Curated annotation (Swiss-Prot):
Main subcellular localisation: membrane
Glycosylated residues in this chain: N110, N180, N401
Organism: Mus musculus (Mouse)
Entries under PANTHER family matching the protein: DESMOGLEIN FAMILY MEMBER, DESMOGLEIN-1
GO molecular function, one term: calcium ion binding
Gene assigned in the entry: Dsg1c
Membrane topology category: Single-pass type I membrane protein
Record remark: domains: Three calcium ions are usually bound at the interface of each cadherin domain and rigidify the connections, imparting a strong curvature to the full-length ectodomain.
Topological domains annotated Cytoplasmic: 541-911
GO cellular component, one term: cytoplasm
Protein name, UniProt field: Desmoglein-1-gamma
Summary of the tissues where the protein is detected: Expressed in epidermis, brain, liver, skeletal, muscle and testis.
Occurrences of domain Cadherin (ranges): 50-157, 158-269, 270-389
Subunit organization: Interacts with DSC3; there is evidence to suggest that the interaction promotes cell-cell adhesion of keratinocytes.
Amino acid sequence: MDWHSFRIAALLLTSLVVLEVNSEFQIQVRDHNAKNGTIKWHSIRRQKREWIKFAAACREGEDNSKRNPIAKIHSDCAANQPVTYRISGVGIDQPPYGIFIINQKTGEINITSIVDREVTPFFIIYCRALNAQGQDLENPLELRVRVMDINDNPPVFSMTTFLGQIEENSNANTLVMKLNATDADEPNNLNSMIAFKIIRQEPSDSPMFTINRKTGEIRTMNNFLDREQYSQYSLVVRGSDRDGGADGMSAESECSITILDVNDNIPYLEQSSYDITIEENTLHSQLLQIRVIDLDEEFSDNWKAIIFFISGNEGNWFEIEMNERTNVGTLKVVKPLDYEAVKNLQLCIGVRNVAEFHQSIISQYRLTVTLITVTVLNVVKGCVFQPGSKTFIVDSRMEANHTVGEFLATDCETGQATNKFKNVRYRYVMGNNPENLLVVDSGIITLRNRVTMEQYERLNKRYEGTVLSIHDSLQRTCTGTIIMVLCGFWTTTEHPTTSTEKPVTLSITPNVDNVHFGPAGIGLLIMGFLVLGLVPFLLISCDCGGAPGGGAGFEPVPECSDGAIHTWAVEGPQPGGITTICVPQMPPGNANVIEYIDNSGVYTNEYCGREMQDLGGGERTTGFELMDGVKTSAAPEICQEYSGTLRRNSMRECRDGGLNMNFMESYFCQKAYAYADEDEGRPSNDCLLIYDIEGVGSPAGSVGCCSFIEDLDESFLDTLGPKFKKLADISLGKEIDSYPDPDPSWPPQSTEPICPQHMEQLASGHPSISPHFGKTTVISENAYPSGPGVQHPMLIPDPLGYGNITVRESYTTSGTLKPSVHFHDNQQASNVVVTERVVGPISGADLHGMLEIPALRDGTNVIVTERVIAPGSSLPNSLTIPNPRETSNVVVTERVIQPTSGMIGNLSIPP
């Protein structure tokens, strides 16, 4: 292989690619954000050299026209065709306008005016190359023109005067404040770099502060700040750009620093000692003024002082009250001094501030004791009554000038009574003397007059006056209080009685036993409490209403909701929508009325009281009355018109609950009647139909099951109900036989048997019952719901001797049919029409046990059109549906047995 030829071919191919492809390339630069960890890619495009001539930088504030052209653009397309160059952007067609212009032929860009970097730090010029038609020949080009900064802006402080404060005695290098200044020149440039400097301090004794030239932080230079010497400093700070260079621009600002006060001065008293004198037995509110000197800030807690006693005031004779406005303490005498007890006192006092001392002097503080010498002056005293008051008792027998008692004053110097002194004359006079009752002479108190009843009442049984002892030479006086209790003023002589009662003589035997609460009474009280404590134990141990011989306890009361009312899955219409209930009439002849009426099950929901008694193993119910319908009684009664035993009501089941099961039977009978009445309003066979022939419809409408009817057979018309037959007869003009009223009013007023309201003893047999019952009977439903638990099959006898019976519907629905249920139909029935029978439990369990539907017995004229058994689940046991036997004139339109729940036991539905 010729490698030389291959290299030449490769070079030629590369040249062609370079010529054809646009001569530009992109460089992506990765920008990593350290804060959130993201990476961004920026595209940098390199233009071809022929398209751009790099723009020259422009200096702000100068005439840059001498540098024109500052840039030149050129396109390679100009070699083949004429090219027009145009520019746009800020400074061209956007404000500020007209700064840049371009030569459209040559592509030279010129600057025409002075620029300001603080207004526009750089310009972006968009360049375009256009052909004669105005179309772009090249991609638009961005041309950046940078404006060079000059130092044309001085620093600017954010505040004219900065305010700061600091505590006195602060440590060195403690931060006071921080200054803030800005420069409008280009950031991170020497022109915007500011240096701070303190150029003046007032007072200027010694420099106290220093400033960081870069950050502007002002700090203390030493710990010699003293508010008591200078409370405020003023600084002048200069900020210069270009890092404080001589060619930089500068600005100045003031700083005012306030020195805060601390408790760094120990207070002291104006004098080191005090001497005072005071007379004995005197009180003084301003005995001495003590001034406190403190150099801290006035009216602050550092300045306010507290003067306290160190010693000498053990008797609490003195107090010191401080004046917070003047910081002066006043010494007061609050308790008299006795010269005989204390002649001289040495009071030691100290002083401190309200606030704690500062840490700088707390170690230097020493308690300074100031001495106050108190001299007590002796004063010649007079006399005093000891005690100050005296009580006397005065009764009505005391006459005038009667001596009540003696009340003498005592000399304070000697402590003797005043009547002991011969050369000193004390005299006594009465001060306050109510009713002017007493007279005093040399301390002897006598009655001026006898106390009368009026005085006694005005004084309210008590006299209170004063007596004065006066020393004339010393002019001393003392006062004593005299109290007299007045008693014995209710006598027979002063207040004669008008009572006619005889006087009662009482004798008091001394030295008898004490009448107060003694040990025997306390013992009885304790025994009473013990007996009360035994009562709860006796109540617990006693037989509270239990049966004799049985243990204590409570008899459980069953709940009605679970005892008698079951949870039924099928709910019929409300009782308000039930039509009139038809009660079947009595059968002819001397039939067993008990079985007949017991099987009818006609009840209502309203009762008027109930009483049940046990009668020799049986059950008797009295007072059982229906508000609507036939009045019944559960005991055998004797009817006047019919023979046999008539039992109007019977209780087949009495469960533990409080609801009679006969009421439940009546309730479901009414529900069944409601279903039958509802069925009258819709066509016969209006139910779910099952077709066995796939793809063939039902001719003449869905009137029944056509599984065994041939095509185009009209025998299905025979299965129509009586209403349709009657309609057909009317259409053909035949004679219409009236049908019995399905809802006759029952019972007739004339045929209702009158039963006695009292019970009679039946000797033998029963009175005969006249055949007063009709042949036409409508039975709505025979429903016997079974309760939970295993029970024996319950046979429900059918009424005998029916004729022309129409059975509307028979439903047996229950949540779970555990026991066996047996349904009996009419015996020896003729002309029977059964419209529908459905045996279908609600739930979806299996049918356990045997489902049996016996055939009709002794029936004639019976036509069975369809019997369908469609269980919803598996039938583990046998399912038997026998054929009708001995039937006559009976039309059974449909029977559907479709269980969907578990049925445990035997389900027997006779035809």
